[in-house]
């Protein structure tokens, strides 16, 4: 994933959640905001991690071979999408997941940009127009809220293959040492697309039960979101694309979404 992103999850979080972008409009470091379809797949896999691996709603564990995604597929198989736009279909997926899970998933899908207005032509196995307006979003929210689903008590947007076991027990964060930072200059891209960043390498030691680290500037704007798993090592390191400044905030995020500030030396 390069010098900044520890893995695909970190890249997806930083390119969609941190930027507040529509799900269809992934933003990468550098000049080349390429359409990274693998980053866009992350929230779909997170639903399987949580409902399947954490809650056991998967054909691998259910005696009837049912589960969350089998029911979503059955919903889609029986749904008449005739005349619906791609934006309407995207929002209907949010509704279907909330209805089938019995949970209100608006917060999850909002953070992943499914409920962010967009009007864009996508080129993914053919060119199609994706349009989602604020009026469409407002109507969808009313529809989902009317289901009366349970609100999530976990930071579902931050579950990953390396942390899903924590979502079964929801342990509190165990604090470690103060973080440190050191200057790091790096280049993203090559040729005319090359961009050089004067950044910082952040080092965090002996913090456990952390699902992600969030770095924000003095205004509260995201700089980077990085995966927090540190097994088998007790040390986490990652690089931000700017120099560390007074007023910046480094937070450790728990399974339940609790944020604990990490002092920086």
Q: What residue ranges belong to the model's regions?
A:
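Active-site recognition of the HExxH zinc-binding catalytic motif
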Residues: 1
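Short, glycine/acidic-rich hinge or "gate" loops at secondary-structure transitions
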Residues: 5-7
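Beta/coil-rich, acidic/histidine-enriched accessory regions frequently appended to metallopeptidases
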Residues: 84-264
